Curated annotation (Swiss-Prot):
Primary site of residence: secreted
Location(s) in or outside the cell: Secreted
Lineage, top ranks: Eukaryota, Metazoa, Ecdysozoa, Arthropoda, Hexapoda
Entry coiled-coil feature ranges: none
Function field: Ligand for the neuropeptide SIFamide receptor.
Modified residues annotated as Phenylalanine amide in this record: F34
GO cellular component: extracellular region
Family: Belongs to the FARP (FMRFamide related peptide) family.
Signal peptide: 1-22
Organism listed in the record: Agrotis ipsilon
Positions of the propeptide removed during maturation: 38-70
Chain segments annotated as transmembrane: none
GO BP annotations, alphabetical order: neuropeptide signaling pathway
Protein name per its UniProtKB record: Neuropeptide SIFamide
Length: 70
């Protein structure tokens, strides 16, 4: 039980840290003054981690509800 709670808290903390980490980065220059404006997707890992965090938080909430009902 304590392990599950600790794991959920760890996942939530990691989500918060990851979101704070991603706010300071600038996209690369990419030659925009020369007309080279290609669409590049930079945040694939962020979306994957946010999906994992969402799954973890939903799972934790479901576990807490089942524990409260017992």
């Amino acid at each position: 039980m304590r392990f599950i709670v600790a794991l959920c808290l760890f996942a939530i903390v990691m989500c918060i840290i990851h979101k704070a980490e991603g706010t300071y980065r600038k996209p690369p220059f990419n030659g925009s003054i020369f007309g080279k404006r290609g669409v590049v997707e930079y945040d694939t890992t962020g979306r994957a981690l946010s999906a994992l965090c969402e799954i973890a938080s939903e799972t934790c909430q479901a576990w807490y509800q089942t524990l409260e009902n017992k």
